[in-house]
Amino acid sequence: MSDSPIKYRLIKKEKHTGARLGEIITPHGTFPTPMFMPVGTQATVKTQSPEELKEMGSGIILSNTYHLWLRPGDELIARAGGLHKFMNWDQPILTDSGGFQVYSLADSRNITEEGVTFKNHLNGSKMFLSPEKAISIQNNLGSDIMMSFDECPQFYQPYDYVKKSIERTSRWAERGLKAHRRPHDQGLFGIVQGAGFEDLRRQSAHDLVSMDFPGYSIGGLAVGETHEEMNAVLDFTTQLLPENKPRYLMGVGAPDSLIDGVIRGVDMFDCVLPTRIARNGTCMTSQGRLVVKNAQFAEDFTPLDPECDCYTCKNYTRAYLRHLLKADETFGIRLTSYHNLYFLLNLMKQVRQAIMDDNLLEFREYFVEKYGYNKSGRNF
């Protein structure tokens, strides 16, 4: 697929780790890597405008195939001129395949070789999603980067189940490639699965790499395994993927996990974490996690994070944010969401600089100590 619309350019490798600085070229522009991608589930990053996302340095956003297929419908979005036009976002968009939502949200699902039958979580109607249908929906959405339809088994499933699952995922990937109608302007990634089993990850990666996708995703992590287990899987999985293609770790957004993923050679990450926790007043700051809704901040007239220069921190106090959230004012959620997204995008900017300076391990140590991971066990 040398004529793929998605190209990865390696700029520099970090001397002491597997980290790499690069950029990904897409039909809607180029973004630097490693990059965190804000999630716009329903064709919007909750409470944020496209202008704000650009302002905070978001070079690409993610949207969910499953949700947009159910509402408003992929054909309607195609009639609107595609997802970019529909949501007024002129930069790159990545869409997932819908697979993860089918396994996590839908009821009474039944997986066969053909695809997955499940109950729509909105109205209970029976639906069917196949590899071909997942590709067709994404072709209608017109995202720059698409995902193959895969099964995402739980991390602790038995070996025999996971083996059958990855073999089916490989067959589904092949079917998806054949069904792809727009390879000239949409790049399709294969998704490596295999839970915690090294030989199954190897088999899955081997199958997918032989199909020559423009990029590869690492799926089936951040689904309940420990941080150490995730790192162990990344240690052996990224090495199985080609150096000249992007590597995307799906569903990961905790700050230490982002840094540890980069150390192991990952280029792209996404997660709903920053906006989800912002809605209950939990904020990521340079000093660690802070729940601004707590009573101790009622008369705290300092910025949310004194070291942050985002719009929220430059203009509003902890006391004001607490007041807005306690009063259920949407503006409060907008401000905490803006800050959390900015925090992760800025973290990745610092990580890119650390790769440039060959001191990523020192940066990790400094960040982890300051954030308070060492004091309080894992948190986000």
Swiss-Prot record:
Positions annotated as active site in the UniProt record: D96, D270
Signal peptide (residue range): none
Transmembrane segments: none
Cofactor note: Binds 1 zinc ion per subunit.
Catalytic activity annotation: 7-aminomethyl-7-carbaguanine + guanosine(34) in tRNA = 7-aminomethyl-7-carbaguanosine(34) in tRNA + guanine
Pathway(s) where this gene product acts: tRNA modification; tRNA-queuosine biosynthesis
Cofactor(s) listed in the protein's UniProt record: Zn(2+)
Segments for region (RNA binding): 251-257, 275-279
Keyword tRNA processing included in the entry's annotation: yes
EC numbers, comma separated: 2.4.2.29
GO biological process, one term: tRNA-guanine transglycosylation
GO MF annotation terms: metal ion binding; tRNA-guanosine(34) queuine transglycosylase activity
GO CC terms of this entry: cytosol
Annotated keywords: Glycosyltransferase, Metal-binding, Queuosine biosynthesis, Transferase, tRNA processing, Zinc
Domain of life: Bacteria
General function of this protein: Catalyzes the base-exchange of a guanine (G) residue with the queuine precursor 7-aminomethyl-7-deazaguanine (PreQ1) at position 34 (anticodon wobble position) in tRNAs with GU(N) anticodons (tRNA-Asp, -Asn, -His and -Tyr). Catalysis occurs through a double-displacement mechanism. The nucleophile active site attacks the C1' of nucleotide 34 to detach the guanine base from the RNA, forming a covalent enzyme-RNA intermediate. The proton acceptor active site deprotonates the incoming PreQ1, allowing a nucleophilic attack on the C1' of the ribose to form the product.
Family from the record: Belongs to the queuine tRNA-ribosyltransferase family.
Protein's UniProt name: Queuine tRNA-ribosyltransferase
Gene it is expressed from: tgt
